[in-house]
Amino acid sequence: MSSLGDPAVLPDGGAWSAWLDDAERIGLVTPAGRDLALPHSLAMAEALVRALPSLSSRQDPGGDRSSSEGTLPAGPRKRVVDLGSGAGLPGLVIAAVLPETEVILVEASIRRAEFLASWSGELGLGERVKVWNGRAETLGRDPAHRGRAMAVSARGFGQPAVVAECAAPLLSIGGVLVVSDPPAAVDAGDLDPLPWDEARWPSDSLSGLGLEALARQSTPFSLSVIAKVRTTPDRYPRRVGVPAKRPLFGTAPPDSR
């Protein structure tokens, strides 16, 4: 699966270049970030693939199996939810390199949602990619989506507490959250996997959402992988906007009023 790190694995490279051109033109990708956009997304896809085999034997030690959240869904396509998809990073890339998946791109902005819908078709992914134009908190309350995802990806979606609270209800037991972190401050000689960043992703707080730390890597990009091991309490996610205003852990952003 190491070949996933090479953008050459993407079909029809010209179409992907045109997609990035359009994303840069309307300000969804910066010129400085463009060159890293595809490699970063491919690294997240690879982290997802590496994590899932190790989860196949996980059991829910105390979760309520009668709840709306079950084990990983059976069937030829596994659901991946990309939070705050923006230009489609990494959601569109995951859909392209993992053809057994269906990918839901969550985007609150109408303009960005229209961009995603248009380009998912242009890239030949329209059948397997759906765009949710709304808030992640709302999606997590929808019985058609709660507890149905094999994986959730998040790149630049929000603070860790917001990501965890919005992702946990969407995941099936045994699923994983793959999230992009700020670059890790490590020496070049240090090896992956890195020790878990307890300050950024406190284990006790994750446990309250039914989550558990799984892996952390610094190369080629800083990523954390978090497993769903038990049912998320029904009270999560809280109302739209509350996870950011009153985070379950960490520090709330300054009030901009």
Map each language-model feature to its residues.
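Glycine-rich, flexible loop segments associated with nucleotide phosphate handling
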Residues: 72-80, 148-150
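Gly/Ala-rich phosphate-binding loop of Rossmann-like dinucleotide-binding domains
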Residues: 95-99
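Conserved class I S-adenosyl-L-methionine
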Residues: 58, 76-86
